[in-house]
Amino acid sequence: MEEPALVEGQSQLPSPHHNSLRKAMAAALVLDGESTMGRRKKKKKESRPESIIIYRSESETLDEEPGESEGGDQPKEEEGDDFIDYPMDDGVWNVPVDSRYVTLTGTITRGKKKGQMVDIHVTLTEKELQELTKPKASSRETTPGGRKACQLGADRGPHVVLWTLVCLPVVFLLSFVVSFYYGTITWYNIFLVYNEERTFWHKISCCPCLILCYPVLIMAMASSLGLYAAVVQLSWSWEAWWQAARDMEKGFCGWLCSKLGLEDCSPYSIVELLESDNISGNLSNKDATQEIETSAV
């Protein structure tokens, strides 16, 4: 009579295989939870890009004037809405409260696809929009004839000159690094052109010269641009100093590629915005309930 009870007691004890299976399932659930949390955190960390350039096709460029005469900038607004609504459905991109989404139209003047019309989708704050739509006459009126340029104040004076002197070695170092980086990319693009797209004689004559001259050329270019940027940033006012200090490379690589006839080798493209008063009009007729607006400059 005791043996069945003993057998029942033994049957209630969990087997080692059952325990290992439970541990494996628990570990799988933990890993699944961690991966899910990781994906959620990764989605939260993803932010909206500051600017996106969309290249226009030839048909869009040719049909621009009829489209404007019929419906104004309505196609651009629809394009901007489609561009925004897709990521917003995922809840990943959030527009800041004081920011607005605009579409700037311009032409590439230097770099790849020179002369092509582009639409730049960018998120700008109200302050940036005010600076963008500020008329040029107002900036000229502040310094008529250069008389007010030597005024003393919080934003201009000897203390600013002292600050620029202190920043001189820092600007030189940063400009040297940035120029070295863009110069290396430009050199590599030029090397690929002569090595892959030109004739065999270019490959055996120009490519070895480019390799041998790279250290000398890159050091001379980076040092010269660093010294030039350090000297140019010496200023009397904060605004002029900031305008000069934030442009580290001075557009030298793009200018060099345009002079050599190798615009596609430029490490960047320079877009000249088309002048328009559409942004100013949208600012004056701003709707508080409108989250997304597109304009053309």
Swiss-Prot record:
Major subcellular location class: membrane
Bilayer topology: Multi-pass membrane protein
Membrane is among the record's keywords: yes
Segments in the Extracellular topological domain: 1-159, 232-297
Cited Pfam families: TMEM169
InterPro entries: TMEM169 (IPR029386)
Annotated localization: Membrane
Cytoplasmic side: 181-210
Positions with biased composition (Acidic residues): 60-84
Keyword Transmembrane: yes
Biased composition (Polar residues): 9-18
GO cellular component terms attached to this protein's record: membrane
Disordered: annotated span: 1-84
Superkingdom field: Eukaryota
Signal peptide: none
Parts of the chain that traverse the membrane: 160-180, 211-231
Keyword annotations of the record: Membrane, Transmembrane, Transmembrane helix
Protein name: Transmembrane protein 169
Taxonomic placement: Eukaryota, Metazoa, Chordata, Craniata, Vertebrata
